[in-house]
Regions:
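Ligand-binding pockets and gating/stacking loops
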Residues: 1-463
Length: 463
């Protein structure tokens, strides 16, 4: 047993749970409370502060896979063809800094819908009849960190729950052995607030997984306890539970510590379920080949396996889109990382009967300028633009083969059927069966919601 337990009886039972756990140095996967709590207690822990697991109206989707293209892809080089920009290439544009830069990439019509898509997304383009492409997105601030938080939490200035936390709050968990909300990232660069729960119960925040390594043990450190078997873990957890009960009787509950203890419980259950979910060697070779043996290929295959196991919201970070220079080379490289895996995901979800119950979202935090941004480099790129960008939806409840909204002839600003971040969030919640104005949580005397006091459902993308 750990050294922290070799103490006097007074210290053992008089210290706070926080002190005990800190001194034990318990890590993710080392402990869990599932071995000593009943299923009823576990269910209660999962639903602390959450509403009944019923939607406001029938849901079209039960799960979400959000492919977040962090860094802000250029809409006019991917989903929003602008032939008029070619006609004025190299010329000054009124109201714009610099000179116009036409897209160096060819656009072609795809599918029965005939929607034009850039050659950099030739794989996803084959599924264009399943996509609803919103070309009139706009946001408030063209700064990466703030805009990413806005896309993921609906808030610019204060710490608010992420959209995945709101979804889990509303729907509840569908698998007691897995977190209901998981964030997959190939590196550790992002702000944790992008998948946090803020003032919602702590167990609603995402479990963040670093997918930079292909092994289960590398992705989820300490998923297996090397020092204690399950019976020994039970004895240690029995002591933790006693301390927990005594502390709860005498002192006010500590929400952060309660969430931590619930995480231990989940960790115990995950030792078997997560090991299976993240083990891609169990997939047939043809499926692994379909996705590709790349970081994004592995991430999206894991995402499908998680949805298959009932995870409500999977956030997939697919960054590298901040192309201030060398856009001719860098943008196709970024697109190539996600094109084949995303196309594979759409194919795979369909063949497994999961497409109609899963909402798939792709998009970044804002768009790019229609003018050149050399940024000290001879090979130009594009600067930030919060007034226009593109997002696409697919899957449950989405009207495929649709283009919604439009930018001006050059792609500088959204001008027709403009869609704000709050509108996108309202639409996502609608597809999951929620009226975004009624999915609320009372905190500090006020009812909060994901969309604040704004947001309209984008009915034009609904099937």
């Amino acid at each position: 047993m750990a050294d922290c337990c070799n103490s006097t009886r007074r210290d053992e039972f008089g210290s706070s749970r926080r002190q005990f756990l800190a001194r034990c140095g318990m890590g993710m996967g080392a402990l869990g409370l599932a071995s000593l709590l009943s299923d009823e207690v576990f269910a209660a822990a999962q639903t602390v502060g959450s509403p009944a697991k019923s939607t406001h109206f029938p849901a079209k989707a039960k799960h979400v896979i959000h492919i977040f293209a962090a860094g802000a892809p250029s809409h006019i080089d991917t989903w929003d063809s602008k032939p008029e920009l070619t006609k004025i290439n190299g010329q000054s544009l009124p109201g714009q800094n610099g000179v116009a830069m036409a897209s160096p990439f060819k656009f072609s019509p795809y599918g029965q819908s005939g929607i034009e898509v850039s050659e950099v997304f030739s794989g996803i383009a084959k599924h264009v009849d399943d996509l609803a492409i919103i070309r009139s997105m706009h946001t408030d601030i063209p700064a990466h960190d703030v805009a990413q938080l806005f896309m993921n939490t609906g808030s610019l200035r204060s710490v608010k729950p992420s959209i995945g936390a709101w979804v889990l709050y509303g729907l509840g968990s569908a698998n007691e052995n897995m977190p209901g909300y998981i964030s997959l990232r190939p590196d550790g660069a992002a702000n944790v607030l992008n998948w946090g729960s803020a003032f919602l119960p702590g167990d609603l925040q995402a479990t963040s997984i670093n997918t930079s390594t292909p092994t289960v043990e590398g992705m989820i450190q300490n998923i297996r306890n090397e020092y204690f078997n399950r019976q020994e873990q039970r004895r240690e957890l029995d002591l933790v539970q006693k301390l927990n009960a005594m502390h709860s009787q005498n002192l006010q509950k500590d929400p952060q510590l309660e969430a931590r203890i619930q995480a231990f419980e989940m960790a115990y259950r995950m030792q078997i379920e997560a090991t299976d979910a993240f083990d891609l060697s169990k997939e047939p070779q043809n499926i692994r080949t379909l996705y590709g043996d790349t970081p994004q290929g592995r991430q999206l295959l894991i995402a499908r396996r998680l949805v298959e196991r009932g995870v409500r919201f999977v956030q997939v970070w697919a960054g590298g889109w901040d192309h201030h220079e060398d856009i001719d080379d860098r943008l196709p490289a970024s697109a190539a990382e996600i094109d084949t895996p995303a196309a594979a995901l759409l194919t795979d979800l369909k063949q497994r009967g999961l497409f109609d119950s899963t909402l798939i979202i792709w998009g970044g935090e804002f768009g790019r300028t229609v003018t050149r941004d050399r940024n000290g480099n001879e090979n130009p790129g594009r600067d930030h633009n919060n007034e226009a960008f593109s997002v696409w939806l697919a899957g449950g409840g989405v009207k495929g083969g649709t283009v919604y909204g439009a930018t001006d002839p050059f792609g500088a600003k959204a001008i027709q059927d403009k869609v704000h971040i709050h509108d996108l969030h309202a639409t996502i919640l609608h597809l999951l069966g929620f009226d975004h104005t009624k999915l609320t949580y009372r905190y500090n005397g006020r009812d909060f919601r994901l969309t604040d006091n704004f947001g309209e459902v984008v009915k034009g993308v609904l099937a």
